[in-house]
A protein has these predicted regions:
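Glycine-rich beta-alpha junction loops
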Residues: 21, 37-41, 189, 211, ...
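Conserved small-domain helix->loop->beta segment predominantly found in fold-type I
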Residues: 273-350, 364-370
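PLP-dependent enzyme catalytic core of the Aspartate aminotransferase-like
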Residues: 2, 122, 131, 145, ...
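Conserved N-terminal alpha-helix of the aminotransferase class I/II PLP-enzyme fold
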Residues: 38-91, 116-123
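Short, well-ordered beta-strand elements within core beta-sheets of diverse protein domains
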Residues: 254-263, 311-323, 380-384
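N-terminal glycine-rich, Lys/His-bearing helix-loop that initiates the first secondary-structure elements
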Residues: 1-54, 404
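A common structural junction motif
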Residues: 242-243, 335-345, 398-404
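Conserved PLP-enzyme active-site core in the AAT-like
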Residues: 2-7, 16-22, 82-283, 289
Length: 404
């Protein structure tokens, strides 16, 4: 069919719906799902040319039209030249490290990152000679002091999981670039509807499409967004050889989920802010961690970076005389809920309640958890799209029977 070029200057909500629509000769209005491992070539010469150049579609491990559509749409939303999909968010991190680093290279990493990310750097990459220094998410001076002549990459997520710490992306970009290094930002919590890290100087934006991009907790997906040069020369050879490819079905599910990203993210943020404000009034809650609250240490920075919104995740802390007592309170609150789901994913339409110290960060050592500020009394809420008062009522079932 004749392709109509989109006009420039479209807003993110429109890009999430209209970008990367490639209709076949049948004129389908919904993006097509190409479930195939191989692509038939018209003749041997064309087959040889495509395999040699990497252009066109030959084999599903190297490229697929549905995956390409997902990549183009995400790149448009993030404002990068290109993007490349991966089987999961963790797969995209593996792709990034394999593509950029070698033995003897050094990475500076926030110690407040997702538990699996911390484990990957602390336990796995060291086996291959990659050196890592963990620093405070919010202390720019620590990032600067950690730089070495062999530092090649700075990596942060903002806001963090689960305590929603926010880093100064522009400041970290300056530190990285002054040293000839790159800055990568995990943008899964914020999504490009709240912040676009490349506009603040980041070189690479990492995504777990499993979360808000999908939006309904259905499939695993990951991606890296960056310059065309980084994607084609550094990342694509890794993912196509190592095989952490994004399946076309998962790409299609996330592609369709992205169409409602604008309305969903705003609703998540509104719900979460209402619940965070309410939790601050509850005597049983010692502290609420949410960037949308003025009480958050990085509130002003978050509002500047995140389009004036706080995101869809908060954590609350329950105090106890001992760690065991605090954990007992947290478990009681979680087990008292009848509406909320006890799980560990986020970005879902359903509100998810979890205990990070024994789930997402359970494989960390106690010292690592303490360094990240994750106590036994911390409970994370990945707020969904239910009515916020129903979520509050569900939490009150447990809170009302706890002592302050």
């Amino acid at each position: 069919m004749t392709k109509r070029e989109l006009p420039p200057g479209l807003r993110p909500e429109t890009l999430a719906v209209r970008t990367a629509i490639e209709r076949s000769q049948y004129g389908e209005n919904s993006e097509a799902l190409y479930l195939t491992t191989g692509f038939v070539q018209p003749d041997a010469a064309t087959s040889a040319e495509r395999f040699a150049s990497g252009e066109g579609y030959t084999y599903a491990r190297t490229s697929n039209p549905t995956v390409t559509a997902f990549e183009r749409r995400l790149a448009a939303l993030e404002g990068t030249e290109a993007a490349i999909g991966a089987s999961s968010g963790m797969g995209s991190i593996l792709m990034m490290i394999m593509g950029l680093l070698k033995a003897g290279d050094h990475v500076v990493l926030s110690r407040s990152m997702f538990g699996s990310t911390l484990n990957l750097f602390a336990k796995e990459f060291g086996k291959f000679g990659v050196e890592t220094t963990f620093v405070s998410q919010t202390n720019v001076d620590e990032w600067r002091a950690a730089m070495r002549p062999n530092t090649r990459l700075l990596f942060a997520e903002t806001p963090t999981n689960p305590l929603t710490e926010v880093c100064d992306i522009a400041a970290l970009a300056q530190i990285a670039h002054d040293a000839g290094a790159l800055l990568a930002v995990d943008n899964a919590f914020a999504t490009p509807l709240l912040q676009r890290p490349v506009e603040m100087g980041a070189d690479i934006v990492m995504h777990s499409g499993t979360k808000y991009l999908d939006g309904q907790g259905r499939v695993m997906a990951g991606a890296l967004c960056a310059s065309r040069q980084l994607v084609t020369e550094k990342f694509a050879p890794v993912v196509r050889t190592a095989g952490m490819v994004l399946s076309p079905f998962n790409a299609w599910v996330v592609l369709k989920g992205m169409e409602t990203l604008g309305v969903r993210v705003k609703a998540h943020c509104d719900n979460t802010l209402a619940i965070a404000r309410w939790l601050e009034t509850q005597p049983q809650v010692a502290r609420v961690y949410y960037p949308g609250l003025p009480s958050h240490p990085q509130h002003e920075l978050a509002m500047r970076q995140q389009n004036g919104l706080g995101g869809g995740v908060l954590s609350l802390e329950l105090a106890g005389d001992t760690p065991e007592a605090a954990r007992a309170k947290a478990f009681h609150l979680i087990d008292s809920c009848r509406v909320l789901s006890i799980a560990t994913n986020l970005g879902d339409t359903k509100t998810i309640i979890s205990h990070p110290a024994t789930t997402s960060h359970g494989r960390l050592t106690e010292a690592q958890r303490q360094a990240a500020g994750i106590s036994q009394g911390v409970v994370r809420l990945a707020v969904g799209l239910e009515h916020h008062e129903d979520i509050q009522d569900d939490l009150l079932r447990g809170l009302s029977t706890l002592s302050a």
